[in-house]
Design a protein with these regions (language model features):
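Extended, H/D-rich, highly charged conserved domains that either
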Residues: 1-53
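SIR2/sirtuin-family catalytic core signature
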Residues: 57-181
Length: 181
């Protein structure tokens, strides 16, 4: 699922059954048209609890993070105005000292020197990778197999072949061939 943690103008939700999808779709259970999701705007105090769709998205993300071996943070600055969201993520990830094998991957345009301090509540010692763009990230270098390759490199000492990764000059057709072949 794609989870829209701050709502989405293209998403709809069935309050009765907890189902969601595009706003033009119908609930697969009751067949009624989805209601539009609410949006959370960039304000100091966001309410992640009162709207059922947003609350359920955050619960799903928390569970996924809790069970994850690796997290990729893509262009998220964790602003002080989003303290509630950062706290929810920290709670889900837990103590980084108990995540001794897990890896954090950050894709951002900020300087690499800022990463360890900015994400200190998630990074165990040096267990992170920094990329300025998607193509040099684990996701871009090892599509469909990023966690598997990170585990092989760091836990099994197997050198990874990143020649099958995505490149900036690839067309949609190239991407499709790369993924499915």
């Amino acid at each position: 699922h794609i989870l829209c943690l701050h709502g989405n103008v293209a998403m709809g939700y069935c309050e009765e059954h907890g189902e969601f999808g595009t706003k033009t779709a119908n609930c697969p259970i009751c067949m009624r048209k989805f209601s539009p999701t609410k949006l959370l705007y960039p304000v100091a105090q966001k309410d992640y609890e009162s709207d059922a769709y947003i609350h359920n998205c955050w619960k799903a993300v928390q569970q996924a993070i809790d069970e994850s071996y690796m997290i990729t943070i893509f262009g998220y600055s964790a602003p002080s105005s989003d303290r509630s969201a950062v706290d929810l993520l920290k709670h889900a990830w837990g103590d980084p000292q108990k995540r001794q094998l897990e890896e954090i991957s950050v894709i951002d345009i900020i300087d690499e020197e800022e990463i360890p301090m900015k994400w200190k509540d998630f990074i165990h010692t040096h267990h992170y990778q920094y990329s300025k763009d998607f193509y040099s990230s684990y996701l871009g270098l090892f599509p469909r197999r990023s966690c598997e390759m990170v585990f092989a490199m760091f836990c099994l000492n197997v050198w990874a072949d990143n020649t099958k990764g995505f490149r900036k000059d690839m067309s949609w057709s190239d991407l499709e061939n790369q993924i499915y072949n």
